[in-house]
């Protein structure tokens, strides 16, 4: 299978070494009966996000659909929306935009591309919150990432892990052991520190890992060092839950 990923979570490699990547991950639970229309709604927003990226307001946007078999068939969200920013300043600038700015910008993004009736329809659906039953947001500060190269592709499968740090050795294990272990085995891997979250977010998690496996990767070498490092590395963290997700829409720099 052809290696597929990653500039995807966002053309990270082109960023300045001094830039601190920030992502906002929104865990969305849909209102009953809206499932069939939701992805078309996000496609409308994809046009807006494409202009935002072109205008330098953000660096990436990804919509991941959650596999309903995740978390023993009881996933805590239906979709993940990931907005990527080159730094904290860029993120805060967007978060401070008033509603009127967004309404005007949506119209500008779709001018000459969509009928006025369609723009009005999706603008109203946005303002009236037609689709979201529940929305939980985490603000993440990138610690490290690893790319196996390639490009995003619809249907790409990724795994989203909520992590609790258990002791002071956790990040060292992630960066000095697990990251090295993933080389040649992951199309993408990232570890983030949760710097903020919405009031309704899950409190125990401190970090988030997102990864995309390489199905053609060689088997992990079984030896004493790897076994012991994995054993003790796992004592530094607790995985509170994992969502299997599929990429359905994206825009990136």
Model-derived regions, located:
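Bacterial Sec-dependent N-terminal signal peptides
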Residues: 1-22
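Short S/T/G/P-rich N-terminal loop/turn motif that feeds into the first structured element of a domain
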Residues: 19-253
């Amino acid at each position: 299978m052809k290696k597929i990923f990653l500039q995807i979570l966002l053309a990270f490699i082109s960023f300045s070494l001094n830039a601190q990547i920030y992502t906002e991950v929104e865990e969305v639970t849909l209102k009953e009966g809206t499932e069939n229309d939701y992805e078309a709604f996000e496609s409308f927003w994809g046009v807006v996000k494409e202009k935002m990226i072109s205008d330098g307001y953000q660096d990436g946007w990804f919509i991941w659909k959650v596999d309903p078999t995740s978390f023993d068939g009881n996933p805590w969200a239906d979709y993940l929306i990931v907005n990527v920013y080159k730094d904290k300043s860029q993120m805060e600038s967007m978060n401070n935009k008033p509603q009127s700015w967004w309404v005007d910008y949506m119209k500008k993004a779709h001018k000459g591309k969509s009928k006025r009736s369609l723009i009005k329809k999706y603008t109203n659906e946005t303002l009236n919150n037609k689709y979201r039953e529940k929305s939980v947001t985490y603000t993440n500060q990138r610690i490290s990432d690893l790319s196996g190269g390639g490009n995003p592709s619809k249907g790409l499968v990724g795994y989203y892990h909520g992590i609790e740090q258990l002791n002071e050795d956790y990040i060292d294990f992630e960066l000095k052991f697990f990251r090295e272990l993933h080389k040649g085995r992951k199309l993408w891997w990232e570890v983030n520190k949760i710097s903020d979250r919405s009031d309704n977010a899950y409190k125990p998690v401190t970090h988030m890992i997102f990864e995309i496996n390489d199905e053609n990767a060689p088997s992990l070498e079984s030896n004493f060092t790897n076994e012991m490092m994995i054993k003790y590395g796992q004592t530094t963290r607790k995985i509170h839950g994992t969502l299997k997700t599929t990429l359905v829409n994206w825009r990136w720099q």
